[in-house]
Amino acid sequence: MPKKSIEEWEEDAIESVPYLASDEKGSNYKEATQIPLNLKQSEIENHPTVKPWVHFVAGGIGGMAGAVVTCPFDLVKTRLQSDIFLKAYKSQAVNISKGSTRPKSINYVIQAGTHFKETLGIIGNVYKQEGFRSLFKGLGPNLVGVIPARSINFFTYGTTKDMYAKAFNNGQETPMIHLMAAATAGWATATATNPIWLIKTRVQLDKAGKTSVRQYKNSWDCLKSVIRNEGFTGLYKGLSASYLGSVEGILQWLLYEQMKRLIKERSIEKFGYQAEGTKSTSEKVKEWCQRSGSAGLAKFVASIATYPHEVVRTRLRQTPKENGKRKYTGLVQSFKVIIKEEGLFSMYSGLTPHLMRTVPNSIIMFGTWEIVIRLLS
């Protein structure tokens, strides 16, 4: 066997690097994945290192953008969840299936269409009777809540995900790591922002009784009234339901991470391992749209699975009756009272406007979050 020169050995070694760097374990050299030598491991895994403050800022901006666009649907959802507006906005969808010989699936589709039509009708009525600005009632406290809530959520999730991965799984992410990080983020966010959401709910339900006199001049007046009449603990009404509601956020993060992983795997199958800088603009936009859409789909599934807690939380945050007595005093008690007096179906009151708000809200929020992260990183 003739001896190779140093140059020949060097050339063979360089040609073998892409094969050795890939995960291929087979013997077919030509099918080995070509990985650029200057590609960092973080870029290969599509988990670039992002500073915590970037998550904080990007989450706040994303949450603000989504909240402003979808505020009218949030107003309708809150009113439909409250028993104060129960008679005024009673849906006709429940009567569609009565005495009907149509298949259940057809009835469900018709009911969904009815809810959609009624939601738009309620928005129209609010606009006619209360004015355009009323469609954005509660936006102030909503933004005051959304911006820190999303900042805290994205910051805590991103930070604890990296921390848990390094502490428990040698830096590798798994669904269990995502679960732990999402739970931590959900509980931290709920505790920090519950007073803001309570004020926002009270303001949106104001001017809802038999009298047309407003109880609160503004959010600040509402805050002072709650502290004066109910004490500081009154600001944490509905916190137990918020903790229960963190399950929705946990489920959304889990689904989003798994769908994002599938999108990345399909990208690798099609293009191979590529650094983000080497992809064309159209490829980047397409993957961004897919990831944003995944956030919306994840929110859709999570919302349907966990929606009843939203109704209970709204009832717990309502202003006490004129005699000072609270109808809804606790999580379990509220579930029992609502189901007994209004039926199981009422646990999904306001679901249609909720989905019409949260799904596009998630798409806008996560999409904006990714854009801001790329700009700041």
From Swiss-Prot:
GO molecular function: pyrimidine nucleotide transmembrane transporter activity
Matches recorded under Pfam families: Mito_carr
Membrane topology: Multi-pass membrane protein
Solcar-type repeats, residues: 50-163, 173-262, 286-375
Protein localization: Mitochondrion inner membrane
Top-level division of the source organism's lineage: Eukaryota
Reactions catalysed: 5-methyl-UTP(out) + UTP(in) = 5-methyl-UTP(in) + UTP(out)
Sorted UniProt keywords: Membrane, Mitochondrion, Mitochondrion inner membrane, Repeat, Transmembrane, Transmembrane helix, Transport
Disruption phenotype: Causes total loss of mtDNA and lack of growth on non-fermentative carbon sources.
GO biological process: metal ion transport; mitochondrial genome maintenance; pyrimidine nucleotide import into mitochondrion; pyrimidine nucleotide transport; regulation of mitochondrial membrane potential; transmembrane transport
Main location (coarse class): mitochondrion
GO cellular component term, pick one: mitochondrial inner membrane
Family classification: Belongs to the mitochondrial carrier (TC 2.A.29) family.
Its job: Mitochondrial transporter that imports/exports pyrimidine nucleotides into and from mitochondria. Selectively transports uridine, thymidine, and cytosine (deoxy)nucleoside di- and triphosphates by an antiport mechanism. Also transports, with lower efficiency, uridine, thymidine, and cytosine (deoxy)nucleoside monophosphates as well as guanosine (deoxy)nucleoside di- and triphosphate.
PANTHER family: MITOCHONDRIAL CARRIER PROTEIN RIM2
Protein name: Mitochondrial pyrimidine nucleotide transporter RIM2
Lineage: Eukaryota, Fungi, Dikarya, Ascomycota, Saccharomycotina
